[in-house]
């Protein structure tokens, strides 16, 4: 009785062995879904024994400590569960490593494919851009050459135009001087003509006066001769 009292006091401080067993059984039931082969067979056998004994105790209505046998059984179940968990962990690690390896290979393949595609695309467009830039440089050189030619032609035309303006200015100056000389010569000629005309008129007047005087003298002489002749005829 004393021992049972001690056991009862121990149960009051911790969860009962039945509760521990129930938790272990529930945990085992959840983990058993992921196990395979002999591990599941061992756990299912031990679970069946524990379940059978628990049902006997429940049907008898006797609540007592399972003692060392149940404790050993639970420890065995715990060991089996640990082994199963360890095996599951190893399988999970292997699967994880395999998955990581496969994923790395896929990622590496995808990365390499993308890199090749990017490199191919870069090469293709780089060549196109290079060709376009070369053509652009050629066009720019041609444009600069044409611009230089046009500038040279413009400078030549400007120089020719300046020379033409100088020549035209000189010719215009010559024309102006010639016109002034012409006007001056015309004035002098008109003046000379006036002088000549005046001199001719004066000479003509002098000649007319002399001729008139001569005619008058001849007329007088003729009249005198006629009178003399008449007188002579009358006298003789």
From Swiss-Prot:
Residues recorded with modification Phosphoserine: 36, 38, 59
Chain segments annotated as coiled-coil in the UniProt record: 66-223
GO molecular function, one term: DNA binding
Keywords: Cell cycle, Cell division, Centromere, Chromosome, Coiled coil, DNA-binding, Meiosis, Nucleus, Phosphoprotein
Gene Ontology cellular component terms for the protein in this record: chromosome; chromosome, centromeric region; lateral element
Span of the annotated motif Nuclear localization signal: 88-91
Important for oligomerization and fiber formation as annotated region, ranges: 69-74, 231-236
Statement: the UniProt record of this protein carries the keyword Ligase: no
Origin superkingdom: Eukaryota
InterPro entries per the UniProt record, alphabetical: XLR/SYCP3 (IPR051443), XLR/SYCP3/FAM9_dom (IPR006888)
Record-linked Pfam families: Cor1
Positions of region (Disordered): 1-42
Stretches the record annotates as Interaction with DNA: 52-57, 88-91
Subcellular compartments: Nucleus; Chromosome; Chromosome, Centromere
GO BP: any one term: meiotic cell cycle
Post-translational modification: Phosphorylated.
Its biological purpose: Component of the synaptonemal complexes (SCS), formed between homologous chromosomes during meiotic prophase. Required for centromere pairing during meiosis in male germ cells. Required for normal meiosis during spermatogenesis and male fertility. Plays a lesser role in female fertility. Required for efficient phosphorylation of HORMAD1 and HORMAD2.
SUBUNIT field: Component of the lateral elements of synaptonemal complexes. Homotetramer; the tetrameric helix bundles assemble end to end into long homopolimeric fibers that exhibit a transversal striation with a periodicity of about 20 nm (in vitro). Interacts with SYCP2. Forms a complex with EWSR1, PRDM9, REC8 and SYCP1; complex formation is dependent of phosphorylated form of REC8 and requires PRDM9 bound to hotspot DNA; EWSR1 joins PRDM9 with the chromosomal axis through REC8.
Swiss-Prot/TrEMBL domain comment: Composed of a long central coiled coil domain. The N-terminal and C-terminal regions interact with DNA.
Sequence similarity: Belongs to the XLR/SYCP3 family.
Designated name of the protein: Synaptonemal complex protein 3
Organism: Macaca fascicularis
């Amino acid at each position: 009785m004393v021992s049972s009292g001690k056991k009862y006091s121990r149960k009051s401080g911790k969860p009962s062995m039945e509760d521990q067993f129930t938790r272990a059984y529930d945990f085992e039931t959840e983990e058993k879904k992921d196990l395979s082969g002999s591990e599941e067979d061992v756990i299912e056998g031990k679970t069946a024994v524990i379940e059978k004994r628990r049902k006997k105790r429940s049907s008898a209505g006797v609540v007592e400590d399972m003692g060392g046998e149940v404790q050993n059984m639970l420890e065995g179940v715990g060991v089996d569960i640990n082994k199963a968990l360890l095996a599951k962990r190893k399988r999970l690690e292997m699967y994880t490593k395999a998955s990581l390896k496969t994923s790395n290979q896929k990622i590496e393949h995808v990365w390499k494919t993308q890199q090749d595609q990017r490199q191919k695309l870069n090469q293709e467009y780089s060549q196109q851009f290079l060709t376009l830039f070369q053509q652009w440089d050629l066009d720019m050189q041609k444009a600069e050459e044409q611009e230089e030619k046009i500038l040279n032609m413009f400078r030549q035309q400007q120089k020719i135009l300046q020379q033409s303006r100088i020549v035209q200015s000189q010719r215009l100056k010559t024309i102006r001087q010639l016109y002034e000389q012409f006007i001056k010569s015309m004035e002098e000629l008109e003046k000379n003509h006036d002088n000549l005309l005046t001199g001719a008129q004066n000479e003509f007047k002098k000649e007319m006066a002399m001729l008139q005087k001569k005619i008058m003298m001849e007329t007088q002489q003729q009249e005198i001769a006629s009178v003399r002749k008449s007188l002579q005829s009358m006298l003789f």
